[in-house]
A protein has these predicted regions:
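Structural/interface elements that position substrates and couple domains in central-metabolism enzymes
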Residues: 1-299
C-alpha cells in the first residue's frame, strides 16, 4: 500500500543503521524484547466476525521462539477478549514469567500515517503488567515528551477503545450523509449545515463532510466486527446497526441519483469516476465506494 513519505523514511533509517530486517521470523523474535503483531483481521465471508487466523498463526511462531521475557504487543484490531485467549494459548507451552500480552491499538489514517505516528492524539496501552507498561513507556518516550497523552488501561479496555473509536467515526459519516439527504429535499446548503455543526466544540468539524459511503480497510470491517462482539455478549448496539445499514444504502442512493440526473437514459453514456481508491493519498481500493457504485450503474 502506498503511503506518502514512507519509502524515503525507510531508506533513510536503513542507511543510518537504525532499521534492520531479519531473514527469518525466528531470528526476529529471538533478538527482540518487544514483538508487535500487525497482521490483517478481515471480516469472515459467512458472517460479521473478524477472521483471526493470521493472528493465531503468528502466535504459534512466537511460542516456538520465546527464550526470555517478551512483551507481545497486539497492534492488529481484534475483538475484546482476544488478548485473554492468546494468553491462554501461550500459557499452555510457556511460563507466565516469560511473556506479557498487551494491547496497543493503532490509530493511523491511510495517507496520513507518518504524521499520525509522530504526532498521535493518544497512545493507548492495555495491560496490568507493570514491567510491560514501563517497557512501552520507554519505547514511546520521545513521543510522550512532545505532549502526547498516554493512557494505561486494561487489555480489554484497549481492544474496545479501538473498535468504539472507529464505529463512532463511521457513525458521524453516515449521520452527515443522511442530513445531506434532508438538505436536498428542503433546499438547504449542506456545506453551511456541516460547518455550523462542526463549530460546536463538543462535536468538531472532522468527519462531517457529506459524500459517498465510508469504505477502506477499517470502518466497514470494524463496525461489523463490533456488532458480532455485541451479539456474542447479548448486547444490542442499535446505533451501530443503523450506521451499517445507512452506509450500505448509500451506494444505491447515489446510483439512483446519477440515473435520475441522466433521466434514466444511462445506456451508452460515458461516466468518469475521478478516483477509485476509498480516500486520497493511498492506492488502497478495499471497500471503495466507486467500485461498489460502478456495478450498480450497469444494472
Amino acid at each position: 500500500i502506498y503511503e506518502p513519505g514512507l519509502q524515503e523514511l525507510v531508506t533513510k533509517n536503513y542507511k543510518a543503521n537504525r532499521l534492520s530486517f531479519a531473514k527469518s521470523l525466528k531470528d526476529a523474535i529471538i533478538k527482540s524484547d518487544i514483538v508487535f503483531i500487525c497482521v490483517g483481521t478481515p471480516t469472515k465471508k459467512n458472517n460479521y466476525s473478524a477472521d483471526l487466523s493470521q493472528i493465531y498463526k503468528v502466535i504459534q511462531e512466537i511460542i516456538k521462539n520465546i527464550k526470555k521475557f517478551k512483551v507481545i504487543v497486539m497492534k492488529s484490531t481484534v475483538p475484546v477478549t482476544t488478548g485473554d485467549e492468546i494468553e491462554k494459548i501461550i500459557l499452555q507451552k510457556k511460563s507466565k514469567k516469560l511473556f506479557s500480552v498487551i494491547s496497543n491499538p493503532e490509530f493511523l489514517r491511510e495517507g496520513e500515517a507518518l504524521r499520525d505516528f509522530m504526532f498521535p492524539d493518544r497512545i493507548v496501552i492495555g495491560t496490568n503488567n507493570t514491567k510491560a507498561n514501563n517497557t512501552m513507556k520507554n519505547l514511546y518516550d520521545p513521543i510522550i515528551k512532545k505532549g502526547t497523552k498516554y493512557l494505561n488501561t486494561s487489555r480489554r479496555g484497549a481492544e474496545l477503545i479501538k473498535y468504539a473509536s472507529n464505529a463512532f467515526l463511521a457513525t458521524k459519516i453516515s449521520y452527515i450523509n443522511e442530513i445531506a439527504n434532508l438538505c436536498e429535499k428542503t433546499n438547504v446548503n449542506i456545506e453551511d449545515v456541516s460547518i455550523g455543526i462542526g463549530l460546536d466544540q463538543r462535536i468538531g468539524s472532522r468527519f462531517l463532510r457529506p459524500g459517498p459511503a465510508y469504505g477502506g480497510s477499517c470502518f466497514p470491517k470494524d463496525t461489523k466486527a463490533l456488532l458480532s462482539t455485541a451479539k456474542k455478549f447479548n448486547t444490542n448496539l442499535s446505533i451501530i446497526k443503523s450506521t451499517v445499514k445507512s452506509n450500505d444504502r448509500r451506494h444505491k442512493f447515489l446510483s439512483n441519483k446519477i440515473k435520475k440526473l441522466l433521466k434514466n437514459k444511462i445506456k451508452n453514456k460515458r461516466i468518469t469516476f475521478l478516483g477509485v481508491t476509498f480516500k486520497p493519498n493511498t492506492d488502497d481500493i478495499r471497500e471503495s465506494s466507486s467500485l461498489k457504485l460502478i456495478p450498480l450503474l450497469h444494472k
